[in-house]
């Protein structure tokens, strides 16, 4: 498996120099990095210096990277391919093109994509019911059934909108030899949901587009009864490009260091291809020693599964 990378989502917020940001990650023992969606343009000169001097390998970028001009607060959903406004979709495509071009320049293997939203808003309600001990109550199941019904209606107009945006981006990525990973999202209302993934992935060539698994996101959905984490990973394994690694406590406390949650990595790891990109994506609040401990734990899981 690819050497474990650390996402800059852990430390980009506290750095003004991109070289120093990447040097901090390298000094923690990580040979590679994912440039997260919080990378400001001011960090870019230092990032290029680190890349040119072989300080660290850049495995992947998370769209949008760098943060688009005009976006005040870094947000991977600042512009969405699903937005009903054509001008916003154009901004999403333009910012994504920039990410793909930068990934190609840096020799990154892939770019992580969020594809948008399709509603309905249901996750906060389900998590609230869960925390009140009403998981699988009548109110809980009725809310889920109605959400699924509405989502099937929404898919019919959301998916063509998203695909229209993705078509030129997939073409550009193919031309530049960069792969795109469509990420499993943490809430039902984001697109695509697990049942929608086959149609989305099948629309694009596997040599360009893959699936991006996120262990914490998949756990959150499993806790709310949307899917089986193991079964989803098993089904998507043939198209799996990479994964975000973090632990999660039910129902929604994710981006935790490994062993601080309930994700059974040992059971899931056999379904992760040996050549997959592996990225530790931890909360900025994670202490340095827990970042290092998570790296050691992941490497031990990989060794045990070999």
Regions found by a protein language model. Give the residues of each.
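N-terminal substrate-binding region of glycoside hydrolase catalytic domains
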Residues: 24-43, 73, 78
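Residue-level detector of anion-binding/catalytic polar loops
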Residues: 31-32, 57, 109, 179, ...
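Active-site acidic/histidine proton-transfer and metal-coordination neighborhood
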Residues: 81-211
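Histidine-acidic metal/acid-base catalytic patches
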Residues: 2-26, 41, 46, 52-54, ...
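Glycine-rich, proline-tolerant flexible connector loops at the mouths of alpha/beta enzymes
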Residues: 35-55, 115-122
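Short catalytic-loop micro-motif centered on adjacent basic/acidic residues
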Residues: 31-37, 181-183, 279-281
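N-terminal small/glycine-rich loop or linker at the start of catalytic domains
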Residues: 1-9, 64-81, 119, 139-149
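Short acidic, glycine/proline-enriched helix-loop-strand junctions
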Residues: 43-62, 128-141
């Amino acid at each position: 498996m690819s050497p474990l990378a650390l996402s800059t989502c852990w430390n980009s917020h506290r750095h003004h120099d991109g070289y120093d940001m990447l040097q901090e990650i390298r000094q923690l023992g990580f040979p590679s990095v994912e440039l997260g969606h919080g990378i400001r343009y001011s960090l870019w000169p230092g990032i290029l210096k680190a890349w040119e001097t072989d300080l660290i390998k850049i495995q992947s970028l998370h769209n949008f990277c760098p943060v688009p001009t005009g976006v005040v607060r870094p947000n991977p959903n600042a512009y969405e391919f699903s937005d009903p406004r054509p001008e916003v979709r154009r901004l999403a495509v333009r910012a994504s093109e920039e990410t793909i071009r930068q990934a190609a320049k840096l020799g990154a293997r892939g770019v992580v994509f969020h594809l948008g939203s399709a509603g309905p808003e249901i996750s906060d309600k389900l998590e609230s019911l869960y925390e009140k001990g009403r998981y699988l109550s009548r109110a809980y199941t009725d809310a889920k059934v109605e959400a699924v019904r509405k989502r099937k209606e929404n898919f019919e107009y959301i998916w063509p909108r998203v695909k229209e945006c993705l078509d030129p981006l997939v073409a550009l990525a193919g031309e530049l030899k960069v792969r795109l990973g469509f990420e499993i999202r943490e809430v039902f209302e984001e697109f695509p949901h697990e049942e929608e993934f086959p149609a989305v992935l099948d629309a694009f060539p596997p040599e360009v587009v893959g699936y991006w698994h996120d262990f914490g996101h998949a756990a959150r959905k499993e806790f709310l009864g949307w899917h089986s984490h193991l079964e989803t990973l098993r089904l998507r394994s043939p198209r799996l490009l990479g994964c975000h690694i973090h632990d999660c406590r039910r129902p929604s406390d994710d981006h935790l260091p490994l062993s601080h949650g309930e994700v059974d990595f040992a059971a899931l790891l056999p379904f992760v291809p040996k050549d997959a990109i592996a990225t530790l994506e931890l909360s900025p609040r994670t202490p340095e020693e827990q970042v290092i401990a998570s790296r050691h734990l992941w490497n031990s899981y990989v060794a045990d599964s070999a």
